[in-house]
Amino acid sequence: MINAFEDHTPVIGPGTYVHPSADVFGNVQIGAGCWIGPGARIRGDYGRIVIGDHTAVEDNVVIHARPDEQTTIGDWVTLGHACIIHNATVRDWAVVGMGAIVSDWAEIGPWAVVGEGAVVRQNQQIPPERIAVGVPAKVLDKTVTDAYKSEWKHWKEVYVDLARRYPAGLRAPGNR
């Protein structure tokens, strides 16, 4: 459901799909060609939420910001199922794994990966093209490879395609 909150109405870019069970409200701007999955909650009630183009916000993701602050999600980002992004910045092409938490004022660099279930603490910086795992998240002595980038580009395109297919393809059983 997309709703205004007080004086703010979400702005949804062309070709972006918001699932009917997702909630997007308040001071939210979502770019073009994004996928907002079932159960996602994008709350622009306290602060502002900005999501770039071609980003996948998978099922049950929560995105929120502190009062008068901003959460920023870049272009071509993947936010895995049930992760929480709170008052943080996630740069272009980054991946936040399922169930991970990215807390206040943290920053995830371009092409960085936050592993499933990891907790990125307040003010923590995950450098570009690095992998962070664990509770609290620790940056591994590994970098994201070109092969990994190529594979993830493919999967990111899959979500862009879903954003295109869902408006016509999602229907009640028996309805064609």
Where are these regions (language model features)?
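Generic amphipathic, hydrophobic interface segment in small proteins and small subunits
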Residues: 30-54
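N-terminal segments that cap or nucleate solenoid repeat domains
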Residues: 1-36
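Glycine-rich hexapeptide-repeat left-handed beta-helix
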Residues: 1-11, 45-48, 53, 59-61, ...
